[in-house]
Curated annotation (Swiss-Prot):
GO terms for cellular component: cytoplasm; plasma membrane. Gene3D superfamilies: D-Amino Acid Oxidase, subunit A, domain 2, FAD/NAD(P)-binding domain. It catalyses: a D-alpha-amino acid + A + H2O = a 2-oxocarboxylate + AH2 + NH4(+). Belongs to the DadA oxidoreductase family. The keyword Oxidoreductase applies. It comes from Ectopseudomonas mendocina (strain ymp). Pfam families: DAO. The gene is dadA. GO terms for molecular function: D-amino-acid dehydrogenase activity. SUPFAM superfamilies: FAD-linked reductases, C-terminal domain (SSF54373), FAD/NAD(P)-binding domain (SSF51905). Pathway: Amino-acid degradation; D-alanine degradation; NH(3) and pyruvate from D-alanine: step 1/1. This is D-amino acid dehydrogenase.
């Protein structure tokens, strides 16, 4: 079966790889000159299934009001006049209930845990190297209120069977020795020992090479113009003035996916959440992170690669603006200097921004659509790296009429539209 994949970020590349492993003829098309040159280029570097949580959570509306008044806030909103922006925010607010949070988090953790297992299997089978570490993730709490608020997340972790550890100040310093000098600033931490880290762009580039070895064709520098539909099927995709045809089509264009879907009458509530990162050269390895930490106050992750520290976070709801805001750099530098003052040279840091494709409920859109040969793999928000392998493998199974290893319940676009045309003959999943 010939499959045309639109997008060569970590999601599109993983989709292509797993489709090729099943024997399909795969072509990947992207406007960039290589894989992982947009959102996947310089993210925070975390593969953190246990921290897979929706931004839409109880208490977030009140927190958001406070954040908007803070200098180093994790969230900023810039009105664009775009109706989609207001609709997306309204949908997000509707998901800020305890009941919806629990449902959405379970879906996210389910896919993220599976994806981590797929990554482990891939690494064991192929030896793919991407400066990865399997040393866990530590969420730092600066206040007792944050420690107490973690109870709802711990309940979900327990229900999902995800191992975790609650740490006091001294235990934090044992896990991350470089934090010993600043432990007085911390009230506690939640550690997930099974979480991982790695350079997403490096991983995607190497996975693309592995996909090519399986016969996948990558076409870079291509202008994807529109989808062409006849009845309930796609007839092809117009690319640089030419209609490209296939048996199945996968849309993995992140924040840009809705633009192609709207003319078909498909509304995918995916909106860009602008994020920022710093890549800092390490000057003192003993004073740098051992693995990765997440500062709960600022929603910023600090991750160790081989000779670099990646600091990533923030969420700006500002449309498709890709300008670099110096105030965000100031925030990232402040947090890094506060926790790891001797770890790296901030004066030599590389500043970057990207657009995370976010859904209002936090769960990505993976699966079939009302068009029988069109499949979506988009809307992963801040968790594209975490969910990439699992999303790609799940989608390949759905396209190939294979039995998925996890339940796909609640992952496709039908949860928004009420329409679902997944493969009618698809068998029930083995693993729930």
């Amino acid at each position: 079966m010939r499959v045309l994949v639109l997008g060569s970020g970590v999601i599109g590349t993983a989709s292509a790889y797993y489709l090729a492993r099943q024997g399909h003829e795969v072509v990947v098309v992207d406007r960039q000159n290589g894989p992982a040159l947009e959102t996947s280029f310089a993210n925070a570097g975390q593969v953190s299934p246990g921290y897979a949580s929706p931004w839409a959570a109880p208490g977030v509306p009140l927190k958001a009001i406070k954040w908007l008044l803070q200098k180093h806030a994790p969230l900023a909103i810039k009105a664009t006049g775009d109706v989609d922006q207001y609709l997306w925010m309204a949908q997000m607010l509707r998901n800020c209930t305890a009941a919806r949070y629990a449902v959405n988090k379970e879906r996210m953790v389910r896919l993220s845990e599976y994806s981590r297992d797929c990554l482990d299997e891939l690494r064991a089978e192929t030896g793919i190297a991407y400066e990865g570490r399997q040393l866990g993730t530590t969420q730092l709490f600066r206040t007792q209120a944050q420690v107490d608020a973690a109870a709802k997340d711990i309940a979900v972790l327990e229900a999902s069977g995800v191992p975790f550890e609650l740490l006091d100040r001294d235990a934090i310093a044992r896990v991350e020795p470089a934090l010993a000098g600043v432990k007085h600033k911390l009230a506690g931490a939640l550690r997930l020992p099974n979480d991982q880290t790695g350079d997403c762009q490096m991983f995607t580039t190497k996975l693309a090479d592995m996909a090519k070895a399986l016969g996948v064709e990558f076409r870079f520098g291509q202008n994807i113009q529109r989808l062409d539909a006849v009845g309930d099927r796609l007839n092809g995709v117009w690319i640089d003035g030419k209609l490209e045809t296939a048996d199945r089509y996968v849309l993995a264009l992140g924040s840009y996916s809705p633009q192609l879907l709207k003319p078909l009458g498909v509304r995918a509530p995916v909106y860009p959440l602008k994020g920022y990162s710093l890549t800092v050269p390490i000057t003192n390895a003993e004073m740098a992170p051992t693995s990765t930490i997440l500062d709960e106050t600022y929603k910023v992750a600090i991750t160790r690669f081989d000779n670099r520290i990646r600091v990533g976070g923030m969420a700006e709801i500002a449309g498709f603006d890709l300008s670099l805001n110096p105030r965000r750099r100031e925030t990232l530098e402040m947090i890094t200097a506060d926790l790891y003052p001797q770890g790296g040279d901030l004066s030599q840091a590389e500043f970057w921004t990207g657009l995370r494709p976010a859904t209002p409920d936090g769960t990505p859109i993976v699966g079939a659509t009302a068009y029988r040969n069109l499949f979506l793999n988009t809307g992963h928000g801040t968790l594209g790296w975490t969910m990439a392998c699992g999303s790609g493998r799940l989608l390949a199974d759905l396209i190939g009429s294979k039995r998925p290893q996890i339940s796909a319940e609640g992952l496709d676009i039908s949860r928004y539209s009420g329409k679902n045309r997944e493969l009618e003959a698809a068998p029930q999943p083995l693993r729930t």
